[in-house]
Structures are given as structure tokens and as C-alpha cells.
Amino acid sequence: MARRCQLTNKKRNNAFAISHSHRRTKRLQEVNLQWKRIWWEEGKRFVRLRLSTKALKTLKAKGIGAMAREAGIDLNQF
């Protein structure tokens, strides 16, 4: 499974590690992904998703149903 948020599709970012002498080497900035069981009110059950912590914060404001509709995800598959 790819290291990608299932709601926001966030993935890792290419960046530079810059030393004191300003030499730059490529590195990857990984997404902070967590497995979470979230109560889905419309389905009356828990849904287990792999989410970024940014998506968890947005989830509290919008709700799981609205975020899934925006992402085009059918929560019955999870």
C-alpha cells in the first residue's frame, strides 16, 4: 500500500537536506500517517482509514461524510 492519505491523497514531498556548508542532498519528507477507526454516522459503524494528521484535524471540522464526498470515496468499501 502506498504511503498516501486515503481522504486527502497527501503523499511524500521531495526536499533538500541542507548542511552547514550549504551542500544540498535530496531527501523525502514523509506524511504523518495514522490508522484510525472513525465512527461513520450515516453507516452506523466504524470505518478504518489511513489518514494524515492534517486530515484528522480537518475531519473534526467537516465530518467524515463531507470529506469522503469531496474525495469521491465510497465509505461502504472500508
UniProtKB/Swiss-Prot annotation:
GO terms for molecular function: structural constituent of ribosome. It comes from the Bacteria. The keyword Ribonucleoprotein applies. GO terms for biological process: translation. GO terms for cellular component: ribonucleoprotein complex; ribosome. Keywords: Ribonucleoprotein, Ribosomal protein. Belongs to the bacterial ribosomal protein bL28 family. This is Large ribosomal subunit protein bL28. The gene is rpmB.
